[in-house]
From Swiss-Prot:
It is found in: Cytoplasm. The keyword Glycoprotein does not apply. The lineage of its organism: Eukaryota, Metazoa, Chordata, Craniata, Vertebrata. One of its GO terms (biological process) is cysteine biosynthetic process. It comes from the Eukaryota. Its EC number is 4.4.1.1, 4.4.1.2. Homotetramer. Interacts with CALM in a calcium-dependent manner. It comes from Rattus norvegicus (Rat). The keyword Lipid metabolism applies. This is Cystathionine gamma-lyase. One of its GO terms (cellular component) is cytoplasm. Coiled coil: none annotated. InterPro entries: Cys/Met-Metab_PyrdxlP-dep_enz, Cys_met_metab_PP, PyrdxlP-dep_Trfase, PyrdxlP-dep_Trfase_major, PyrdxlP-dep_Trfase_small.
Length: 398
């Protein structure tokens, strides 16, 4: 059991997680060299034994030894039977929606990553899909939104950037009253270490591996994990047909990142909690949002559903947009940048940066105001992070 999580009342850590992260996938026995580090297979094509008879690989878009090792590793960490990798998180999203046809309806969480919102609102809707944005944290609203045409429900938990939670198990029970609806959970913020959506009833667990799963801000990638053989076959066909697969080198980097996922996430949790507590006690801060804090309205759900919390902390600085901008101008350790989940600490202003594509009216409804600041708390020394935040807050409010 993870010490920090268990002492805070969260679920115990998933058994054998670190061992699987290190050993599942690139087993040395599969290579003639017995290399203990995953080899990078850059070949685009593979020699066949006879016409139409291969030894497992034909063309790198359809399958690659390095990519296969990563997919095997992620499947184990997600508690899944299968995993598919994609060139981007949005490539994974696009591929999933190709399971549908024109006229089908998608229910999407009202608050999601800005790129997901933009894709559903401005791209998928142009191809005959009907998109409804619903607050799926309120299960009655989800149930009321389902129609005979609903074929996919997309939830993100915690949401980006206000860290609202959806009860995955409750959503799954509602969705699966209807046999032909697929429940997708975007698990980017939690990673496989803190949350396993498939075990809670989701049909598809997807995430942007760009963030915590890789953890080094040097790979852009999407992951999709499933337990259903049927879904795997359909998605595997689409993966090959659409061709949005990652490079072997990126697969190598991500597989390497997984080796330290456990120790990284534990440090993110410790630092995230320390930052959240510091901000909550600071008079220059209006409100702090962090599922690990008892003040979070869904703190109990977080403890039932997760083994801990990542380093994502959002807060409202007192004042106006100008105060937020002065704060962001004065941070030193926290880099002003989009993205999240790397070893380095980042800060951003969602209303102007990651969620600028969300309509202003929707941002106001969701609480994405000009004073909302999102932090991705990294792995630096806790004391240094708190000092940096403290001096930047003082600069914003002398």
């Amino acid at each position: 059991m993870q010490k920090d999580a268990s002492s805070s009342g969260f679920l115990p850590s998933f058994q054998h997680f670190a061992t699987q992260a290190i050993h599942v996938g690139p087993e040395p026995e599969q290579w003639s060299s017995r290399a203990v580090v995953l080899p990078i297979s850059l070949a685009t094509t593979f020699k066949q034994d006879s016409p139409g008879q291969s030894s497992g690989f034909v063309y790198s878009r359809s399958g690659n030894p390095t990519r296969n090792c990563l997919e095997k590793a992620v499947a184990a960490l997600d508690g899944a039977k299968h995993c598919l990798t994609f060139a981007r998180g949005l490539a994974a999203t696009t591929t999933i929606t190709h399971l549908l046809k024109a006229g089908d309806e998608v229910i999407c969480m009202d608050e999601v990553y800005g790129g997901t919102n933009r894709y559903f609102r401005r791209v998928a809707s142009e191809f005959g899909l009907k998109i409804s944005f619903v607050d799926c944290s309120k299960t009655k609203l989800l149930e009321a939104a389902i129609t005979p045409q609903t074929k996919l429900v997309w939830i993100e938990t915690p949401t980006n950037p206000t860290l609202k939670l959806a009860d995955i198990k409750a959503c799954a029970q509602i969705v699966h009253k209807h046999k032909d609806i697929i429940l997708v959970v975007d698990n980017t913020f939690m990673s496989a270490y803190f949350q396993r959506p498939l075990a809670l009833g989701a049909d598809i667990c997807m995430c942007s591996a760009t963030k915590y799963m890789n953890g080094h801000s040097d790979v852009v990638m999407g992951l999709v994990s499933v337990t259903s053989d049927d879904l795997n076959e359909r998605l595997r066909f689409l993966q090959n047909s659409l061709g949005a697969v990652p490079s072997p080198f990126d697969c190598y980097l991500c597989c390497r990142g997984l080796k330290t996922l456990q120790i990284r996430m534990e440090k993110h949790f410790r630092n995230g909690m320390a930052v959240a507590r510091f901000l909550e006690s600071n008079p220059r801060v209006e409100k702090v949002i962090y599922p690990g804090l008892p003040s979070h309205p869904q703190h109990e759900l977080a403890k039932r559903q997760c083994t801990g919390c990542p380093g994502m902390v959002s807060f409202y600085i007192k004042g106006t947009l100008q105060h937020a901008q002065v704060f962001l101008k004065n941070i030193k350790l926290f880099a002003l940048a989009e993205s999240l989940g790397g070893y380095e600490s980042l800060a951003e202003l969602p209303a102007i940066m990651t969620h600028a594509s969300v309509p202003e009216k929707d941002r106001a409804t969701l609480g994405i105001s000009d004073t909302l600041i999102r932090l991705s708390v990294g792995l630096e020394d806790e004391k240094d992070l708190l000092e940096d935040l403290g001096q930047a807050l003082k600069a914003a409010h002398p």
